């Protein structure tokens, strides 16, 4: 079933989706880490692939920039494609010197003081 932002059929998308912001980073991850990766989406330039990693079926798809774009793609993946988990991968900034460049952060949650929608 296609949506306005995703051309995939439900069986094209794995239960676990890695989501970098940059669609070209999704392509790089698919080409370098996934075995037998197949493109399932290219609508609006947002690339999505499914393949296997160490025998586990995994998808990777760009989210675009910002919360609005992430909100659209994550909503559709959960609501229409029966995804169980989305794992955000990629870069970010830090306000703390305790978290130096090239650190790895495993985040359990986040919040915003924004009043945006």
Where are these regions (language model features)?
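Glycine-rich phosphate- or other oxyanion-binding loops that anchor nucleotides, phosphorylated ligands
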Residues: 42-117
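N-terminal short beta-loop-beta anion/metal-coordinating cradle
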Residues: 1-72
């Amino acid at each position: 079933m296609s949506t306005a932002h995703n051309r995939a059929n439900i069986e094209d998308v794995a239960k676990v989706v890695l989501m970098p912001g940059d669609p070209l980073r999704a392509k790089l991850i698919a080409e370098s880490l996934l075995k037998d990766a197949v493109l399932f989406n290219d609508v609006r330039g947002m690339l999505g692939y499914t393949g296997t990693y160490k025998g586990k079926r995994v998808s990777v798809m760009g989210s675009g920039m910002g919360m609005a774009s992430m909100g659209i793609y994550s909503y559709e993946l959960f609501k229409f494609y029966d995804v169980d988990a989305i794992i955000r991968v990629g870069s970010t900034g830090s306000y703390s010197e305790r978290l130096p460049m090239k650190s790895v952060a495993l985040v359990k949650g986040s919040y915003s003081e924004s009043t945006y929608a």
